Swiss-Prot record:
Top EC group: ligase
Cell compartment(s), UniProt: Cytoplasm
Domain TGS residues, every copy: 1-62
Gene giving rise to this polypeptide: thrS
Protein's name in the database: Threonine--tRNA ligase
The family this protein is said to belong to: Belongs to the class-II aminoacyl-tRNA synthetase family.
Catalytic activity: tRNA(Thr) + L-threonine + ATP = L-threonyl-tRNA(Thr) + AMP + diphosphate + H(+)
InterPro entries, sorted: aa-tRNA-synt_IIb, aa-tRNA-synth_II, aa-tRNA-synth_II/BPL/LPL, Anticodon-bd, Anticodon-bd_dom_sf, Beta-grasp_dom_sf, TGS, TGS-like
Organism: Leptospira borgpetersenii serovar Hardjo-bovis (strain JB197)
UniProt function note: Catalyzes the attachment of threonine to tRNA(Thr) in a two-step reaction: L-threonine is first activated by ATP to form Thr-AMP and then transferred to the acceptor end of tRNA(Thr). Also edits incorrectly charged L-seryl-tRNA(Thr).
Amino acids binding Zn(2+): 337, 388, 514
Pfam families: HGTP_anticodon, tRNA-synt_2b, tRNA_SAD
Length: 639
């Protein structure tokens, strides 16, 4: 008998020869139709068909867990591979990984050996995939010596698989299959093809074998897979909506920002985009002031010695930009925290001063490969709304709790009401003592639990210096965006020898808390553009009011209205062009102005305004003071 310990600490006995599926069906029957794989001792993920061979802590993985989701998508990649080789007998498979960012959740790179594949071929491939699903093949696994595997794939002419096997250090490799078809793979996979009911091929592109332009050009087919048609349909709806809302398209239409060939990956903010950027910064700056934060600024270029001391030189080197000053190595900062710690260290500190909260809108630079750049979502220069808090250890939980409240206050201000929260735990490559990591992780959990906030666990996805809370916001079309973080850091205070004098006169190390709410202003603005479809709420809108004249006779009256509104603090544009009013209205609608003031002789004579609100066809007549009062009330009501 073996013993398996569940997450609730209950222990279950398992008979010899039982598979993990047998165990789930007996002990956890409510999960038998959702289970995709199991995770043992927090790291070893195995198929449900594997025989239990040891005592272990066990987690059942479903589609809602990341590892379960990855198992599902990777199995769908195998489904695609089998369908392609059933239809195209000469096709050679290479690799079929799971991805998080791209036009699909998985892809397979395939050498069709001269056959041209286009999206028009997708229906035929999808039909074969559906046939395989309906056949409900059992997914089998076999472990064989490398020599045998090479001989097997040589007979099939699978030259890429032979090359992959040659790079594997182990003397054995695993093969997964359905029916007579099989593929080289580490796994894990779902138990049978019938589980993969809902899928869609989404895109096609070219890709060089091993990303080397001197190698063969392959065909990369992307796809997505879901447990149900409802979830697939929802995803496809999101994709179509996302195309309409693409922040790159809307940003160009509203003249918010651009990217230039002289600086790929570096956004250029135009006047209206700068208004939006400043609105976000000003709001958060005011909220920080209410909560006792002190704003600082640190240099963009700092000595390599600093980055070696902070650990970034070893852990972040490939993402940094370097320069030489006076024959010494320097780097553009990829993060703000080391500079902030130098400011803390510049003075002596007493326990009476702590917690000490520093805030910085810090511009950072990180090298990203050209192929992963994506509008404002993935750039090489961005501004973080960083805060670094230095506190005694006993203040950690209260500070984290306050930051949680602060974070949700900000998100709700922008109209976000649904969230998912995760705790990311210690990665393999990390720094610090085991007891500090355990204490910090437990404190983050307790802080969320006391606020009644449910959370998931992202095993091994914390920063190298400490665990973190990740805040995900759901936008207006149901997509989740990871934005804010709260990170606990015991490493940097130790590395920089930061201390304070406690009440007993002894020097002690503070704990350091890294906090960001937007994450980066650039990315958060991209999210807002797509969330609102460019129709920003009045308080941050760069196009609040457009004044349109019907005839030239009212130009002076329109200018007088313009000046009054500008003096009241609003962003106003005046259109006195000698154009038909219909054309002016259409142009203003495209600019997504919150309000149009359509002024003719009637309004001039009565001293009133004809007001049309964005999204409405009718106009209302208001006094000038009444309109200003309404605008002020609308901004106040935004929270």
């Amino acid at each position: 008998m073996y013993q398996l310990t569940l997450p609730d600490k209950s222990v279950k006995k398992v008979a010899l020869g039982s598979t993990y599926r047998d165990f789930i069906e007996k002990e956890l029957p409510f999960l038998k139709n959702k289970a995709l794989a199991v995770r043992l001792n927090g790291k070893d993920i195995q198929d449900l068909s594997r025989v239990v061979e040891t005592d272990a802590n066990i987690e059942v993985l479903t589609y809602t867990e990341k590892a379960g989701w990855e198992t599902f998508q990777h199995s769908a990649a195998h489904l695609l591979g089998m369908a392609v080789q059933n239809l195209y007998k000469n096709a050679n498979l290479t690799v079929g990984p799971v991805i998080e960012n791209g036009p699909g959740f998985f892809y397979y790179d395939i050498d069709f050996q001269g056959t041209i594949i286009t999206p028009e071929d997708f229906p035929k491939i999808e039909a074969e995939m559906e046939r395989i699903v309906k056949a409900d093949y059992t997914v089998w696994r076999k472990v064989v010596p490398k020599k045998e595997a090479i001989e097997t794939f040589q007979k099939l002419g699978e030259k890429y698989k032979i090359e992959i096997i040659g790079g594997i250090l182990s003397e054995e490799v695993s093969i997964y299959g359905m029916g007579e078809w099989f593929d080289l793979c580490r796994g894990p996979h779902v138990s049978n093809s019938g589980i993969l009911k809902s899928f869609k091929l989404t895109a096609i592109s070219g890709a060089y074998w091993k990303a080397d332009k001197d190698n063969a050009m392959l065909t990369r087919i992307y796809g997505v897979a879901f447990p149900s048609k409802k979830e697939l349909d929802q995803y496809l709806f999101q994709i179509e909506e996302a195309k309409k809302r693409d922040h790159r398209k809307i940003g160009k239409e509203l003249d918010l920002f651009s990217f230039q060939k002289e600086g790929p990956g570096f956004p250029f903010w135009h006047p209206k985009g700068t208004i939006l950027w400043n609105s976000l910064a000003d709001y958060l700056r005011a909220e920080c002031n209410k909560r006792g934060y002190q704003e600082i600024k640190t240099p963009a270029v700092l000595s390599s010695e600093l980055w070696k001391k902070s650990g970034h030189w070893d852990n972040f080197h490939e993402n940094m930009y370097f320069t030489d000053i006076d024959e010494e190595d320097y780097a553009l900062k990829p993060m703000n925290c080391p500079g902030c710690s130098l400011i803390y260290k510049h003075h002596l500190h007493s326990y009476r001063e702590l917690p000490l909260r520093f805030a910085e809108f810090g511009s950072v630079h990180r090298h990203e490969l050209h192929g992963v750049l994506h509008g404002l979502f993935r750039v090489r220069a961005f501004t973080q709304d960083d805060s670094h808090i230095y506190a005694p250890l006993e203040h950690l939980e209260s500070e984290v709790t306050d930051i949680i409240d602060f974070t949700f206050t900000v998100y709700k201000k922008f109209g976000f009401s649904e969230f998912k929260t995760f705790i990311a735990t210690r990665p393999e490559k990390s720094q610090g003592r085991d007891e500090d990591w355990e204490f910090a992780t437990n404190t983050l959990k307790q802080s969320l639990e006391k606020k009644g906030i449910p959370y998931g666990i992202k095993e091994g996805e914390g920063a190298f210096y400490g665990p973190k809370i990740e805040f995900n916001i759901k936008d207006s079309i149901g997509r989740l965006w990871q934005c804010g973080t709260i990170q606990v850091d015991f490493s940097m205070p130790e590395r920089f020898e930061l201390d304070y004098t406690d009440s007993d006169g002894q020097k002690k190390r503070p704990v350091m808390i890294h906090r960001a709410i937007y994450g980066s202003l650039e990315r958060f603005i991209g999210i807002l553009i797509e969330h609102y479809e460019g129709k920003f709420p009045l308080w941050i809108s760069p196009n609040q009011i457009r004044i349109l004249t019907i005839t030239e006779k009212v130009a002076e009256y329109a200018k007088d209205v313009y000046c009054e509104l500008v003096d009241a603090g609003f962003r106003v544009e005046l259109d006195t062009r000698n154009e038909k009013i219909g054309a002016k209205i259409r142009d203003s609608i495209l600019k997504k102005a919150n309000y149009l003031l359509i002024l003719g002789e009637k309004e001039m004579e009565s001293g009133t305004l004809a007001v049309r609100k964005r999204g409405q066809e009718d106009t209302k007549t208001l006094t000038r003071s009444g309109f200003i009062s309404n605008l002020q009330d609308e901004i106040k009501s935004a929270g």
